Amino acid sequence: MSVKRRCVVAPGDGIGPEITEAVLRILDAAGAPLEYDLIELGEAVYRQGVTSGVPPEAWDKIRASGCLLKGPVTTPQGQGFKSVNVTIRKTLNLFANVRPCKAYNPFIASPHPGMNLVIIRENEEDLYAGIEHRQTHEVTQVLKLVSRPGCEKIVRFAFEYARAFGRRRVTCMTKDNIMKLTDGLFHRVFDEVAAQYPDIASDHMIIDIGAARLAASPETFDVIVTLNLYGDILSDIAAQLTGSIGLAASANIGEQAAMFEAVHGSAPDIAGRGVANPSGLLIAATQMLVHLGFGDIAQTVKNAWLCTIEDGIHTPDIFRVGLSAEEVGTAAFADAVIARLGKTPKQLAPVQYQRGVRDFPEPELDEAVSEPADREGTPEDISVNPESLKLVRDFLLKAHKQQPATPVRVQTSSPPRSNRQLVGVDVFVYWDQDGRCADTLAGWLQSAAPAGAHLSLITNRGVKVYPEGLPETFCTDHWRCRFRFDRPAEDYGRCLELLGSLAAAGVDIIKTENLYTYDGEPGFTLGQGE
């Protein structure tokens, strides 16, 4: 008998408790060797005054287990509340979000029956750092953070995932034609890492045309890797194209822990009616089983689910007259899956988690994994084990031997340190004089600045308004004022001298950003029109 593995389960909000109960019934019926620690997350916790939605005692259980199966939670709208999902992902360093999206044609209606792609999303950085400020009466700001180690970890993960699971192409999507430093860094790292994987094709798309092509022809994509915000949006679009977002699962993988969840939300409008589709959370649970080393149980459960779909036993979100055989609720759907445990689908490709990616002989595992596999019939939703981050092939070896994962530290390369010089500072100010004339503001700032600090630029919402601004440009009360030093500063004292002079003149300083060059190359972007 397998040793039971303890995992943490959070039923969540809305339809969460209903679908969680259904999923746990299926896992128990399949003989999953699991013990559950139930925790409360989300709405009820927010009402207790915990703004993160995660109570302290829940952290202890999650960290001790290293594995969380989470139902959907509701984050209250408005200020003062943090997303539970984002909080858990960032706190536990769950840097990789893996969302497979596959059509189950002809049993679930989809406009794209051939789609079978995986979206791998950076999970910790980008705008989801959630650092926002209201800086003036009219202007708010969000900080977009992108690091080289963060980029390299997720890009390397994507290529190793592709190599391990027989995927042939990795597509990077960014908006680096506009965000040249942040998205530009992600693109550059992608190109650097891609060169190390000559067996995997690679390409890059600007996110807007990439999203359009994904919506129009998802079957042309294989693996997409992208930044946090873009990946969140793209994966929901792709999930809906499969026929229902209720089918989509998400694995959040880190070096010490993992979280598995459905992609959909808490759907409070149908909560308590017993009609919610538990498929997304069930597929997430099979990902969790593979992650924990119970691939045989995961295979039994997923194949039973495929048989249920194949037999036309469908919840209302995927039921179609003439296509489905019977419309059932949440509990009846779970009963149907349980009744089919031990069976394999006849038309849909059965999954083979015990054998890993393909049904090859055990002794040939290592060699087989290193070769691209035929896409046809490739299992689309095997979770990537944290140990695989040393390289994903290690996961397959572990999964075959049915051993639980042991965490490892992901190694990233460190670029050589550049000659970093402080050459100026962007001073952001609040100024709301009549007319909001940039030339007037510039004259005031220049008269207040000390010798050696030259005002070179003023922008408003990123558009140059001084020198030679245009009268048609609309201006708010928020101004970026770029000062350049006549020579590189030896320390921050030059900035303090400038800021002291401006403050003494009555300038309302909101924030500053230092301007650095790295081996002579600017570490900052030009203003629009500069």
Task: Label each residue range with its predicted role.
Residues 13-16, 66, 120, 158, ...:
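Buried hydrophobic positions in well-ordered alpha/beta secondary-structure cores of metabolic enzymes
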Residues 33-55, 212-214:
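N-terminal beta-loop-helix "entrance" segment that forms/cooperates
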Residues 35-38, 165-174, 197-205, 294-302, ...:
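Flexible, glycine/charged-enriched surface loops at secondary-structure junctions
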Residues 45-47, 215-300, 307-312:
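Glycine-rich phosphate/nucleotide-binding loop
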Residues 46-141, 229-231:
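N-terminal glycine-rich phosphate/adenylate-binding segment common to multiple enzyme folds
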Residues 130-131, 139-172, 176-179, 308-352:
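Glycine-rich phosphate/pyrophosphate-binding loop and the adjoining helix
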Residues 342-530:
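C-terminal non-catalytic interaction/assembly regions of soluble proteins
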